[in-house]
């Protein structure tokens, strides 16, 4: 294991140190997504499906417009993934009161998949962060939050 003190030298945040952070993000994200990726691969889904299932599960009756705002993808990109999830009965589509708004809800099948995928990631995160104190964890969360662009921080705040 790399010596964390060698990885973290905040007084000398030069390009070399920033590149270490880039690499840490790459490797941690790769490992963070690897468990769910294996499950998704078995049902011929990918990370785009995972993101849609996650956010539809997080907020019941999420509109397509809201989902597009969260994911920041085009309607065309969402359409392919969403149609597959609806056709395979992971997501239920309902028409809003004004007949123009489409609302998304996870089906029982979708809830089960979302839980299965999230449980892996929650467990992975918990097994790491339980070794740190609240100050360290909040510092980590603060860094991640500040890496989000201002307008996207508002989206994050709205869903939390």
Regions found by a protein language model. Give the residues of each.
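A structural signal for well-ordered alpha-helices, especially hydrophobic packing surfaces
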Residues: 29, 114, 148-152
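Short, locally clustered residues in the helix-turn-helix/winged-helix DNA-binding domain
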Residues: 26, 54-58, 118
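C-terminal regulatory/oligomerization modules of transcriptional regulators
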Residues: 1-13, 134-160
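N-terminal helix-turn-helix DNA-binding core of bacterial DNA-binding proteins
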Residues: 34-77
């Amino acid at each position: 294991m790399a010596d964390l003190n060698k990885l973290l030298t905040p007084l000398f945040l030069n390009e070399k140190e920033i590149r270490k952070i880039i690499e840490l993000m790459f490797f941690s994200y790769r490992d963070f997504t690897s468990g769910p990726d294996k499950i998704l691969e078995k049902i011929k889904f990918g990370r785009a499906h995972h993101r849609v299932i996650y956010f539809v599960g997080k907020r019941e009756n999420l509109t397509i417009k809201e989902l597009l705002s969260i994911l920041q993808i085009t309607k065309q990109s969402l359409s392919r993934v969403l149609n597959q999830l609806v056709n395979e009965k992971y997501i239920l589509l309902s028409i809003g009161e004004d007949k123009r708004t489409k609302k998304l809800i996870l089906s029982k099948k979708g809830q089960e998949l979302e839980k299965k995928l999230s449980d892996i990631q929650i467990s992975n995160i918990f097994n790491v962060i339980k070794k740190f104190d609240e100050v360290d964890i909040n510092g980590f969360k603060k860094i991640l939050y500040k890496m989000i662009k201002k307008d996207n921080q508002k989206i994050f705040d709205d869903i939390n």
